[in-house]
Amino acid sequence: VTGQYLYMLHSSQAHTTVSEISALGNHTLLVDERDGKAGSDTFKRLYRIDLAQATNLLDLNNAYDPDKGGVLVDGKSLEGYVSHTDGAKANEQVAAETLRAAGISPAQGRLYLDVTKLVWGADPSGNTFSHDKVEGVAVTKGGQHLTLANDSDFGLEGSSHTGTQFELRQKEYQGKPETGEALDIDMTAVPQQYRGDGYIAPEVNTTDAGTEVKVA
């Protein structure tokens, strides 16, 4: 292990998780942050982070206790330290400021692409698969082209049981069985309103020797 960094989720209310982290460059990453719901008001976004601007926890001289959660600040785990005030626990910005005051800079996410707005903007009817659980993000051409893969949960929404009798419930979208889908995205063709300032077009140079892609 050469590095360990903190990343702040962007919406406490959305109960988001990180399903994928893909490399854009040597120290820039694309983070897939999402909820698990389907609909036009859901949270599915890709954020660009730069580890060069964040604190490597392995470089700290703080006490470390695996039984207490790892790196300690004032005798508390990082989670415990951030949660010791209601303001920091409920607001990611306050939490980041609390950590910076302790000498730790989390990786800051800059919006790269709002997947929800892109999908529903392209088809407001909802007939296009909404990609409720984006769990795979393939990056090519320095981030100009993305392929998103959706987890279908094996086509199962859940199960129910009465006594020893179990029944599996089929996962559906728009009344049809969900089998999972992939979404190819050409970022150069995505309207500006769906992108954020985290999208920086890479520099592409093509010569007789081949193609070189430089990521800022």
Q: Which residue stretches match the model-derived regions?
A:
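Sequence/structural signature of beta-propeller domains
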Residues: 1-216
